[in-house]
Amino acid sequence: MQIGKILGIEIYGTSSSDEKLSRVRELGLQHGINYKQKDYVDAIKDLTHGEGVDAVFEMLGGEHVAKSVKCLRDFGRVIVYGAATGEIPSLDTRLLYAKGASVHGVWLSYLSANRPLMQSAWKQLSEWLAAGKLHPVIGKVYPLEEARTAYTLLQEGKNYGKIVLKIA
């Protein structure tokens, strides 16, 4: 959200609760959709007057990959960077070529280890952090002994921001 806001991008987002959407609006979200109350494919089409969006950052997996493709405008792309649902995606590729869309996978651990590839990105992020434009969102800090509690919070989708385990 914060990077999109810095870049002046119109940002649409989904969440399971209005409370989380409200908090994310503070980070730059302009159009929030509670996917437990409304189908986000329909909502995106309504909000964009049938056009769809240029890109979707998708981290749920399962059915959400195909649904994300349906949210795209012509020649849009879905960037898959996770599978929080644990479900394997199934995608009818006709959805892609019907609108010239593409799906890209991104594994941040791999990219982070590739210093030459990521050098300019780390430099830019560091500049934004130093300028106070980016603010890491820490949801809660747990002592290591409470790792199970922290993990349960993640599994239940009740977290907001990063959960930190304090080792010492």
Residues covered by each model-derived region:
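N-terminal Rossmann-like NAD(P) cofactor-binding module of classical short-chain dehydrogenase/reductase
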Residues: V56-F57, I79
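Glycine-rich phosphate-binding loop and adjacent beta-alpha segment
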Residues: L7, S15, V24, E63-K133, ...
